[in-house]
Amino acid sequence: MNDSSLPQGTRPTLALSVTGLTKHYDSGFTLNDVTFDLPFGYIMGLVGPNGAGKSTLIKLILNMTTRDAGRIEVLGLDAMADEERVKEQLGVVLDSSYFIEYMTVDAAERTSRPMYPLWDHNLFDAYLRRFGLGRNKKIKDLSRGMQMKLMLAVALSHDAKLLILDEPTSGLDVLSRDELMDILSDYVADGEHSVIFSTHITADLERCADFLTYITHGMLYYSGPKDEFEDAFRLVKGGPDELTDGLQRAMVGIRTYATGFDALVRTQDIPHIGGTNGLLTQHASIEDVIRLTNAAEHTAIGNTNKGDVR
């Protein structure tokens, strides 16, 4: 990292620190009091249902919209007061292209290069070859997936210390998604770079994320190590007559079917559900947790303290 870009006499330990972040909209939606940290050298997945506040959070980090409360530090710098220095060290991929559609790939480099003191033309060229992007191709003629790859090439070609990606795998085929996950894993391997990316494809998280931040209804449900999140819940399946009183008290979410139910229970509460004969208990996937904590039949009976998955 360029020492000149850091506060004098300090070296940050966190790539990103968000404290008490709040944003109110006239529509009534509020992103409420979100707090989390991302250390250097790790990948954080940002998850939640549509409309949960993931894109709002990313826009706030990038100062694309104003916050009502809270503080954001990027690489030890105040994201608002030190915006220019911060953005020199960010790599950004949004869910839609930020380039003018009649611009060529070559012109995209010419407009991007002056914004980044550490721009590496040879590295950008290498990514263009890797992604199969011709310099004379117009942005409007690129598929959504290829436009994402162009933004990624720009993001990776100026020694950005933090990548912020909004649904980067949307529009990519399976092979391209695997390639992207490999690139991100390599990117953080030196311990000096970090990634935060939002996604609705939980398989991507299970493959490469170290940390998970889960937002639902504008509130932080959990932020911490992905492994702890995965270990914190169990999926309990049973027939229509097997929904015991103990299970109803313990569950934090449920979806019922004609043939039975899927219930989400914190691992620590499994011994208290009673009547387990006939019930199938298994590890809950990230997708299971998101699905059942946002199901139409989400119960308020169980312990649903946000941010506490122990």
Q: Model-found features: residue ranges?
A:
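Extreme N-terminus of proteins, especially the signal/transit-peptide cleavage junction
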Residues: N2-L14
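C-terminal coupling/interaction segments
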Residues: N2-S5, G253-R310
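A general boundary/transition motif marking the beginning of the first structured unit of a protein
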Residues: G9, I100, M115, L172, ...
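ABC transporter nucleotide-binding domains
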Residues: T13-V18, K23-A203, R207-T216
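Short, surface-exposed beta-strand/loop "edge" segments at domain boundaries and coil↔beta transitions
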Residues: L163-P168, E242-G246, D269-G274, D288
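ABC transporter nucleotide-binding domain
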Residues: L180-T267
